[in-house]
Amino acid sequence: MNVIIQAGGKGTRLGRHTKNKPKCLVEFEGKTLLQRQIENYNNEKIFIIGDYKFKVLEDYVATFFSDYDIEIIKTTGATGTLSGLRQALQKIDNDDSILFMWSDLVLDGRLHHKNSDIQIFTTNNFLCRYRLDDDSKIIKETSANDGIMGAFTIRDKNVLSSVPMAGSFVSGWLKDNIDKLDVIRTNISFAREVGELKHLDREFKNTTSRFFNSIEFAEEEVTKKCLDPKYEHLIDDEKRWYKEVKKLNFKNIPDIISYNLFKMERIVGNHCHQKTDDWSLEQKIEILNKIGNALHSLHSLSTVEASRQDLVDVYKNKTFDRIKLVEKLIPFFESKDININGTNFKNPFHPSLRDEFLLKIEKLNTDTFNIIHGDPTFNNFLITKDEEVFFFDPRGSFSQTKVYGDKRYDWAKLYYSVVGNYDSVNEKRFKVDNYDSHSISYTLESNGWESLEQHLIKLSKIDRHQILLLNCLIWFSFCGYLRDYDSILVSYAKGVELWNQIC
């Protein structure tokens, strides 16, 4: 089967999320819409039709999907869901079946062709602009009852021989020709649509796990499962960490009910960035003290000799490897000076500045590893109504070392949320206003904790320059972990800003 994804159009219903990228690159539940679609068809020939922000789409596919058989088709002046379809059909063999679908659909499984000229997929899961009635007539009526969702399988390209260069596939060509076709209707329940800006923002706010995990909440317990065997080792590292710190009587964790099912006590509490308007400055200081004291308690449980190679892997190799992955997506990457929100900053990845950057990284040495959490951002601990701190989702490893690592990294990750507003980037509460080959302008929603920077530095007992440098590396590393285009740009800018505070 050949897969044709209609990814044209500006996606204006998604507001700021499509200002700088086509809608197929919008993230949903940890993956871009495009990634979700092509992963269902990894052994098929895939054509992606694009127009808006075409260079971004082209570079993105080259960066992240080089292992797939993908061809991108740029429409030339044509509009509507038919635009680019004729161009794609010219590249398909006469007898091959075809899947044609819109890029903003989220399908939790493959679609298969049934013997017919055309199979029209309908759904009752969300509102569609057109529906298919019992006589297989296309009715212009906003409906969630047999709504035409924007996915079709076609026997072969000869069925589509009369499609025009532009216009609407559903209300135009299909409606005009449906009486001449052998049509099958298939209603499916495993389809979702991204929809509008408010729906997408709600999704970002309510996401509780990464795409390879599932979290099930019961009244008094939480069960965590790995959905992808490739990531099972992360769950194993997490279990190992809980066992070790529990054995050493660390109190600031939920009780583990079962390691086999990975079921733990449910802690009722709040994340710091979600309660910022309800807590006074004095309360925030007291809560930050308790978080800091809990980290000190964790770090004091046990120590081992540090691994120099692990330090190099985490601070140097991971940073440079991840930037290498996405550098072609960053339009200002090659600029020696980058104007960020109206101020000029030196770019440490410019060849003339890289040696100085590397020298700073190489000085990040330590003789001792402590037991660490590895990722104590706001999302990974809860504050109860009694202002107790409970950590969860530990990293469980520091490169090759399990459970132990550089305690400075924990403090840097806390700074990442408190001062860096990482959680606003993670939840897409930001906007990239403009960018070009030498500049970027962005706005980032505050978590309301930045004023406690000096208090946090003092609490950590770590040199401020070291925490800033580690945060610089964390933001740069985050670039290569991300798949959201705007987040990549902002994360790189944040890394550059931090570097210029210490260089």
Regions found by a protein language model. Give the residues of each.
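N-terminal glycine-rich phosphate-binding loop and ensuing alpha1 helix
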Residues: 1-58
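Conserved beta-loop-beta/alpha segment of the NTase-like Rossmann-fold superfamily
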Residues: 57-58, 62-134
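Catalytic-core segments of class I nucleotidyltransferases/pyrophosphorylases
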Residues: 132-205
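ATP-binding glycine-rich loop module of kinase domains
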Residues: 211-243, 265, 273-280
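Conserved HxN/HPN-centered segment at the entrance to the catalytic loop
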Residues: 246-261
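Active-site acidic catalytic loop and adjacent metal/ATP-binding pocket
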Residues: 358-405
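Active-site activation/catalytic loop segments of kinase-like enzymes and analogous catalytic loops
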Residues: 397-456, 472-487
